[in-house]
């Protein structure tokens, strides 16, 4: 398929720069994947679209404040470090700016000196492998010294960094938030439980590759980035039980969807406790094995994310719905409004 088939006109003013004051005050577009019919609502009414016995699957990853600003120990030159992937213990793959200042053996000091990074290997495109040395607990030091790596299309500074975390975030490791989950409040989750909806959790640590544009003219040639995922025994058992009893499985976000489809594809449609790295690329023509519907935000033109959504609801239905969203001035991307596909 040609990349241009997933393009649409998006005015820049519709890219949400800040989150709404109330998480569930965002608008909700409901898209019928069979007919393409669209209805408009608010996210606080999401419970109306669920039935007893359905299961909502959430990604409980937590975003690292992964952007660090430090200086070279020998010269005092300023250096910016972005954590990409934990390799082993205190060893990380990072992105450094300006990369030319950091050679193998360079020591970078952050804050008051309780965190240091030693460059152990030079990679291409500004990549560097480093080993951290610190006093105390690494993630606590990072929380006090690091900044949130907001998506490139968000230009505003975030006043409250918790607004770039879901209310159920738990497992630290993402470079970006699973943004479909940002709309949920604890009260909304409680209301779903009271209605008899099961709530299950998976973990997928979102990498910065999620913002990487698809550049191949034919989308089949695009290579997805790999991301770490995990599903425990409790979630696997819950999902298999829901499926057996005829309930629907609704994933929250493309990250939850990719995790569920990775696991179900590997086990003949069943769910099993597992962990590993997934680079699954879902686009039209894909047969879904895990989910019946999903909640997601409004995505970038020509992105792998709009291709996944198109695989579930049909490209023509999705583009028609997106054009209506533009006309109705929905807010787009990470801090934007939501879509329920069912």
Swiss-Prot record:
One of its GO terms (biological process) is queuosine biosynthetic process. Transfers and isomerizes the ribose moiety from AdoMet to the 7-aminomethyl group of 7-deazaguanine (preQ1-tRNA) to give epoxyqueuosine (oQ-tRNA). Disulfide bonds: none annotated. Monomer. Pathway: tRNA modification; tRNA-queuosine biosynthesis. Pfam families: Queuosine_synth. One of its GO terms (molecular function) is S-adenosylmethionine:tRNA ribosyltransferase-isomerase activity. It is found in: Cytoplasm. One of its GO terms (cellular component) is cytoplasm. HAMAP family: QueA. The keyword Iron does not apply. Its EC number is 2.4.99.17. This is S-adenosylmethionine:tRNA ribosyltransferase-isomerase. The gene is queA. It catalyses: 7-aminomethyl-7-carbaguanosine(34) in tRNA + S-adenosyl-L-methionine = epoxyqueuosine(34) in tRNA + adenine + L-methionine + 2 H(+). InterPro entries: QueA, QueA_dom1, QueA_dom2, QueA_sf. Keywords: Cytoplasm, Queuosine biosynthesis, S-adenosyl-L-methionine, Transferase. It comes from Bacillus pumilus (strain SAFR-032). Gene3D superfamilies: QueA-like. Belongs to the QueA family. The keyword Zinc-finger does not apply.
